[in-house]
Regions:
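Secretory targeting and sorting signals
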Residues: 1-21
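Short, surface-exposed ligand-recognition loops at beta-strand->loop->(often short) alpha-helix junctions
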Residues: 30-38
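Structural recognition of the beta-strand scaffold that forms the well-ordered cores
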Residues: 30-31, 64, 151-155, 211, ...
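Autoinhibitory propeptides
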Residues: 43-127, 367
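C-terminal subdomain of the subtilisin-like protease fold in secreted/lumenal serine endopeptidases
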Residues: 54-55, 91, 260-267, 445-446, ...
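Active-site core segment of subtilase-fold serine proteases
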Residues: 117-228, 250-258, 262-292, 317-332, ...
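Mature extracellular/periplasmic domains of secretome proteins
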Residues: 141-147, 223-226, 242-265, 275-281, ...
Length: 551
């Protein structure tokens, strides 16, 4: 792990005085320089505080520093050249951990899936993709299937580029991994230097997201909302599911530097579900860390936006109104077992990146177009809604609690094998079939590693890529050439996305309860607003057809 990092084009430069490491060092920090501060003064402050600079992001004004955990933040922040510091990535000995994804894998084994009928211009499994039909991608592709010149960044756990639905659209040259494996939390490193190559994904999350955005129409498996756009991996996530500050900000900077058009962000920045400026429940050091995370993410999001990147983010799976947040019981989620109750003040706390500047927030719907029970909502943060899957949709019908209510997309075979859903020979196991795994091979292919594998998940993580795909179609339809490639003002992209969304009124009555679905009163959700804009649907359900045919 020592010395392992990825260069960000034009932004992250070689280590300053990188050596064997700091004695007793066990944490990597992101140090935020004051605007206009003297760099040499900042580096001197880091050294005086006991840290070692290993990487610099000059465009954001950040230093990645390795230092002993005890007292470093307070010491370095005392310098007038430093605005703050926050943990970027753990690099020392910590308990083995994995971020839970219980919402996304809620299905307990119903193999029921509607067979459907193959549609012209679609792929064999697309009949199961009710989300494509809800956002009318099946119609939009007849007018605009997306342009190769439009580049969509997937800031996630990686992308499995071996999948035949991903391979035709994957950009090997531009893709980068900003999150080297951390053995203490990710397990034994499979690759030299603990850096997974681009085109690899142990988690599966990023591959699932990428397929929904832009799986190719190729006669195999599934197709995405924008099946002809280019997919770029800008990995910021660990195999264990965590996304820490340093890799995320580096990935966003890179997205701006290389001219990506849209970036999907289906995550929140660990370890804090909400970052607060001065929460009384937090220690002074924790408060300082969160202020730094807010400032660093704000810089990174603003940087990407200024460079023409449309930013799309998931609202989250905590079933709460983000404008009226409940007590946070899950933070910090790293290291494991350190969370404590934190009352959240909406005026001084934010969920990042979705509550950061320029991010289009997306809520999740089930196939009935009802807000999924798990999905966050709220008029302050939402822009649009999109299909995210809801296992418990259609209560009282045979479709209740079936895999057909979830989102089917591309998935890495290695991840399915690690979870016992595919065997060593590449065949689906009974558990895999029950949980919704599927397999399709191109004609004449007998090597299972060249086949397509697919899996069902639910979450706002699945809703956001539907909106990202529509945004990519908007850039494809209305974008123009610009220095370094093709593109469109992200504010204009956002306006079209929202203006062409299918308006949906709040339910009547507006208080939606999920008692029949087996949820406690905590899940009850009050929809506020008008038909044209409300807390469940925002401006409406994203509509690819309306977006590419507007006049």
């Amino acid at each position: 792990m020592t010395g392992a990092f990825v260069l960000v084009a034009g932004a992250v430069v070689a280590p300053v005085g990188a050596g064997a490491g700091v004695a007793g060092g066990d944490t990597e920090y992101l140090v935020l320089l004051e605007e206009g501060a003297d760099r040499s003064q900042a580096v001197a402050a880091v050294k005086a505080a006991g840290g070692e600079v290993v990487k610099e992001n000059a465009n954001l004004g950040t230093l990645t520093v390795r230092a002993a955990a005890s007292g470093f933040v307070g010491r370095v922040s005392a310098s007038s050249a430093i605005e703050g510091a926050a943990r970027s990535r753990p690099i020392g000995t910590v308990p083995r951990a994995e971020k839970p994804l219980s919402v996304e894998s809620e299905n307990g084994g119903s193999g029921k899936v509607a067979a459907g009928k193959k549609v012209v211009g679609m792929d064999p499994l697309d009949a199961q993709l009710w989300g494509l039909r809800m956002v009318r991608s099946d119609l939009a592709r007849r007018v605009q299937p997306g342009k190769k010149a439009v580049k969509v960044g997937v800031l996630d756990s990686g992308i499995d580029a071996r999948n035949p639905d991903i391979a035709p659209n994957f950009d090997w040259k531009l893709s980068r991994n900003f999150a080297p494996d951390i053995p203490e939390i990710d397990g034994v490193c499979e690759f030299s230097g603990c850096v997974d190559p681009v085109g690899w994904d142990d988690s599966g999350h990023g591959t699932h997201v990428a397929g929904t955005i832009g799986a190719a129409v190729n006669g195999v498996g599934v197709s995405g909302v924008a099946p002809n756009v280019t997919l770029v991996e800008i990995r910021g996530g660990q195999d264990s599911g965590y996304l820490f500050l340093g890799p995320v900000t580096d990935a966003l900077t890179y997205a701006g530097d290389v001219g990506l058009d849209v970036v999907n962000m289906s995550f929140y920045v660990d370890p804090w579900l909400y970052n607060c400026t001065a929460n009384p429940a937090d220690s002074p050091e924790a408060q300082a860390e969160q202020r730094t995370i807010i400032r660093a993410m704000t810089r990174a999001l603003n940087y990407a936006h200024r460079h023409g990147v449309t930013l799309v983010g998931s609202l989250g799976n905590n079933h709460e109104d983000l404008g009226k947040p409940r007590t946070d019981l899950s933070s910090p989620d790293f290291p494991a077992g350190t969370a404590y109750p934190r009352p959240i003040d909406n005026a001084t706390c934010v969920d990042l990146p979705v509550e950061g500047p320029h991010v289009i927030g997306v809520s999740a719907l089930g196939p009935s177009s009802t807000k999924a029970d798990y999905s966050n909502y709220g008029t302050e943060q939402i822009e649009v809604s999109a299909p995210g899957g809801w296992f418990r949709d259609f209560f009282g019908t045979p479709q209740f609690r079936t895999n057909g209510n979830l989102i089917l997309s591309t998935y890495p075979v290695n991840t399915l094998q690690a979870n016992g859903l595919v065997d060593a020979a590449g065949e689906l196991t009974p558990d895999g079939i029950a949980l919704g795994a599927q397999k399709q091979c191109p004609a004449g292919v007998t090597d299972y590693t060249k086949c397509g594998y697919y899996f069902v998940l639910q979450g706002t993580s699945m809703a956001s890529p539907h909106a990202t795909g529509v945004a990519a179609l908007i850039v494809s339809q209305y974008g123009k050439g610009r220095p370094g490639g093709f593109g469109m003002d992200p504010d204009k992209v956002g306006r079209i996305l929202m203006d062409t969304a299918q308006s949906r009124a709040c339910p009547n009555p507006p208080l939606l309860t999920y008692t029949n679905e087996g949820r406690p009163a905590e899940f009850n959700a009050l929809c506020e607003g008008t038909r044209n804009f409300n807390g469940f649907y925002g401006h409406g359900i994203v509509d690819a057809w309306a977006a590419v045919t507007r006049r």
